[in-house]
Swiss-Prot record:
UniProt-listed GO biological process terms: peptide biosynthetic process
Keywords for this protein: Cytoplasm, Elongation factor, Protein biosynthesis
Compartments reported by the entry: Cytoplasm
Record's function text: Involved in peptide bond synthesis. Stimulates efficient translation and peptide-bond synthesis on native or reconstituted 70S ribosomes in vitro. Probably functions indirectly by altering the affinity of the ribosome for aminoacyl-tRNA, thus increasing their reactivity as acceptors for peptidyl transferase.
Protein name: Elongation factor P
Entry keyword 4Fe-4S: no
CDD domains xref list: S1_EF-P_repeat_1, S1_EF-P_repeat_2
SUPFAM superfamilies with a match to the protein in the record: Nucleic acid-binding proteins (SSF50249), Translation proteins SH3-like domain (SSF50104)
Pathway noted in the entry: Protein biosynthesis; polypeptide chain elongation
Family: Belongs to the elongation factor P family.
Chief place of localization: cytoplasm
Name of the gene this protein is made from: efp
Amino acid sequence: MISAGDFRKGVTFVMDGHPYVVIDFQHVKPGKGAAFVRTKYKNLKTGSTREEAFNPSDKFPRAHIETKEMQYLYNDSDLYYFMDNETYEQVPLTLVEVEDAIKYLKENDSAIIKFYEGRPFQVEPPIFVELKVIETEPGVKGDTATNVTKAATVETGAIVYVPVFVNEGNIIKVDTRTGEYMSRV
């Protein structure tokens, strides 16, 4: 059991027979009245999100999540196929299940897939990925007074803001948690 007072981002719990993951939370202690935990959470089966205030002493059973490292193979219209590295079984996932992770995955990259009751529900890309810049504007000479950035499209289609010295064809390191440029490779 987990109490609402122990909610943190990424904590999973079961409420009314449905599994949820905490997306965001805020402990609130008003001047008058009892403290509460304002929580934004997502249903792991349907993908829908809700916001609700809980009493910190409210208790919920934990949702047991299984994780597997899998390899991203390819996408076919609306489905993204991942292969289990141990059994070689292919698992198709929808765009809702892969969410923003697909912006940072190239074919044959590894990712962590989370399962609840044998059903995949979330993809976590590696924390840092190396991607090739395929389109960006050339840097303007002399435009270095401050940390100037420009938009760059990488090979997966994601847009990353990079310093002006990064050019097309460069390979850059990106933090997938924030989508920020880290360095040139």
